[in-house]
């Protein structure tokens, strides 16, 4: 198959899935809630979308946050600072609430970065008083940090890191070096559910997603970004390096591919999503109607994909750790392993492209 001639095959427009922005709420100045529904879907499509979105939202949506504070003022019993009204715990929580902005792509793979708060009382220390690295700004300059009640200096060295909802910043920080800050994650909560329904004598499924985000990220923006991350990654999978090929008995073909320069989280959920998509390969070529029983179970006599084996290998490059994902795909004639990989990746791109409509919906609002 010539890759230059390979294209997405969109299903029947009459039955093609569409999404609805069901609900949106804002809570104070910190959080936003959104609820979405996508239908009609097959059982396999809804499971694939559910898995992929959950992983992408929690691992691929990034934000800049303060993760560590080294306070030069003397602390009393690790609870209070002389001359400051707020407790140490309250001050650290206030740092964790500060929203930092910048062009995130410029900070990926770099850092941690250092910021300095150096003020003298009496005054109310705010986010605007922090000296930040170039390219990083605070979203709300008046965000409160601490009330300094006496004429004393208040000096804090802050660590800034690019974090996801599953990362906790750098580890190995002792109490002598400062205090860890628990930052507000970009995605605070993701729930999803699948409901079946009948229409026109056929069984379909509806995927419902609800999400709580930390501002300035809003739910439909997170859904758009997460889907784009998945699509960009599977564009790379489409171009995976073909390492080996062999033919076995009974029309079995085995192909080995390699996808490089991945993070650990990316390797894991590429494997999970791709496995589901590979076992969907070939269904659209089947002659005759599919019954529910055939559609809901994997029949080795029907599907052209017989097996998927994955292996992950870590390596160092320019001081950073990356992973290579090796994919061994077993197919049955006439489907070739590379054709199966391309068709599965194309199916993933087709499904997640549905959420690119979220940007248009946002413009309407």
From Swiss-Prot:
SUPFAM superfamilies in UniProt: Insert subdomain of RNA polymerase alpha subunit, RBP11-like subunits of RNA polymerase
Gene3D superfamilies named in the record: DNA-directed RNA polymerase, insert domain (2.170.120.12), RNA polymerase, RBP11-like subunit (3.30.1360.10)
GO aspect biological process, one term: DNA-templated transcription
Main EC class the enzyme belongs to: transferase
Gene Ontology, cellular component aspect: chloroplast; DNA-directed RNA polymerase complex; mitochondrion
Name of the protein this chain belongs to: Putative DNA-directed RNA polymerase subunit alpha-like 3
Protein keywords: Chloroplast, DNA-directed RNA polymerase, Nucleotidyltransferase, Plastid, Transcription, Transferase
Family according to the record: Belongs to the RNA polymerase alpha chain family.
Protein task: DNA-dependent RNA polymerase catalyzes the transcription of DNA into RNA using the four ribonucleoside triphosphates as substrates.
Subunit text: In plastids the minimal PEP RNA polymerase catalytic core is composed of four subunits: alpha, beta, beta', and beta''. When a (nuclear-encoded) sigma factor is associated with the core the holoenzyme is formed, which can initiate transcription.
The UniProt record lists the keyword Transferase: yes
Origin species: Pelargonium hortorum
Chief location: plastid
Compartments in which it is found: Plastid, Chloroplast
E.C. number(s) listed in UniProt: 2.7.7.6
GO molecular function: DNA-directed RNA polymerase activity; protein dimerization activity
